Amino acid sequence: MTEPSLLPAAKMEGLALLPLTSPCPRIPRARISRQPGRWAHLGCSPGLSTGPTNLQQHPQKPRPADCSHSRLSWAESLSMDGFWMEVERIQQRAEVKKEDCGEGRSQLLEGDTESQWLQDTGLSGLAGGLGLDGDHQGLLSTLTQTQVAAVCRRLDIYARSARRRQKAPVRDVRDIFGVFTSRELAPENGVSGMKWTKINSEDSASPLRSAEPGGPQELAGMEEVFNMDSAYSEQAAVLLQRAWPSPGGTTAWGKGPLPRFRIPKGRLGVTRIGDLSSRDMKKIPPLALIELTALYDILGLDLKRCKGGKWKGPDSGLFGVPLHSLLEADHRVFPSTQVPLLLQALLSCLEKRGLDTEGILRVPGSQARVKGLEQKLERDFYAGLVSWDKVHPNDASDLLKRFLRKLPVPLLTAEYLPAFASVPDIPDLKQRLQALHLLVLLLPEPNRNTLKALLEFLRKVAAQEQHNKMTLWNVSTVMVPSLFLPRGRPPKLTKGGKQLAEGAAEVVCMMVQYQDLLWTVASFLVAQVRKLNDSNGRRSQLCDGGLKTWLWRTHVDRDKAGEGLEATPKVAKIQVQATWPSMDLLQVPLNPSTRVTHVLKLFTEHLNPGSQPEEGSENPNSLLSHNTKPVTFLVYEVGGNIGERRLDPDAYLLDLYRANPHGEWVIRQSPT
């Protein structure tokens, strides 16, 4: 068997079109002490990870007090009663069958981990020594210096593990005669140490208990900038070179409300997840995985991933079936739905009649009624014979949590559930958000849409705290078992793993609080998609024999770059694809102050010549009344270096033209 080889050194230097001094740039990495095996109970057996190797080992130290979780009161911050009560109820109901608790997931081994990573990032050809093809060159040309270093590190680990596997191992004397030590005695109950165990040492005390009573509380009213223009790993590398972490800032997150973050709107506007076409959106997860790996490398953390077990159960029904199977059945009724209809019905029932119910989500419903309702839904849901007005809110909330727990694949996915759980290991709050942001982008579309619907509902519950007595922290602790204890892993937990439960609750709390930020596509990722599309477009022109076209376009781009502002057109021609026969082209003056909202305003005035919108109107989408129904119009960027992108009303047309001179602008009626 031939030995797998890496790229030759000469070709490795071409991994990215960046002025690198070496094939694998040396990026400084933080040394962060972590609790080993902290989240092993989530289904991954102890093993190697994708993170950097040979890190210096440090003795365990408590997380600093300024990294404590956000709470609304000191007494509440120490309370995890909602979590333990929920776990106890799950145990009493015995929802998870014993035979279902087998080998659901296992952690990937070294070598296999890197091979899977390269495959998920679209760089699997590099591991086989096949050289750089067009797809690899296009992707690698978009990467930053820290991202290139992450790719090089995975290739190096893969090559070393492949060489070790091919060599015949030297037999150890213990392999022949065996060895016996008292440490190998199995526990009496035959269960390995995959539990939430109590931490008694003072070094591992809860950060809340070690926090100073007079900690920084002024952060509650602060609004910090969350920069998405540059890669998160590049930001972390800069902070590390500046003796990160610095005193104060987001690292000093004490008790009280979570600080607020603001995404600065650049000249190109903000891009939400739903703004990009499906073709462009498919390019985001590989880029996000490379960036997340690079960020964890800089922070000195291990990015743990698991292999998902194969689903052998039924693919029909409502409870205990995969999300994609649910959506396939739903599409027969509503072809455009993106969230399971059952979940929508449960959330709608709770929003109408349960938001003001005291203890909603925490107080259990009647188990007899819940079981009967589940059976009725399985039988009559699609026939529309379920009367939701008669469903008790507590029964509906119980059924909601049961629906999540019964998913054969966790909502946060088996592959990335350990990564979600390890987010609290990051000391800096802003960097935790960066990691969470990338993890959300890695979720499959059905999981991401379902999670978004759930988080929107949880935010509404927390907003009614005065009536339902459920704070954001209460809501988070109650929902942890349904999100972090997936099917196939019964909750054999002891009432001592408070820190571990707090960490999971913190993740849920952050996802609810910052969901608008998390469902934004970072500007640097959109820029990488543009570069990737541009590279693929130029290569396809050459492959199709359009050499003259490609050379002509190259010269045009070069001339435009040389002429600068003189080549910029004075008028923007915008196509109109809305259902309005009176207009098919709109001309708008193109100057540095022209924004998308001005285009929509001008378009509305053309449709209704006598109407003038009120000054100071906050509606940038120019709602128009037509046939007594409000009509919303949107502007899209189509073609060029982007497939399709819905434009932010505050985006500037001149900057959009410079970013994508070969694209077009189109006005369409909103699909909703």
UniProtKB/Swiss-Prot annotation:
GO MF, one annotated term: GTPase activator activity
Pfam families: RhoGAP, Ubiquitin_RHG40_C
Composition skew (Polar residues), residue ranges: 47-59
Region named Disordered: 43-68
Highest rank taxon of the organism: Eukaryota
Chain positions of site Arginine finger: 362
PROSITE patterns associated with the record: RHOGAP
Chain segments annotated as coiled-coil in the UniProt record: none
GO BP, one annotated term: signal transduction
PANTHER family tied to this protein: RHO GTPASE ACTIVATING PROTEIN 18,19-RELATED, RHO GTPASE-ACTIVATING PROTEIN 40
The protein's name in its UniProt record: Rho GTPase-activating protein 40
Originating species: Mus musculus
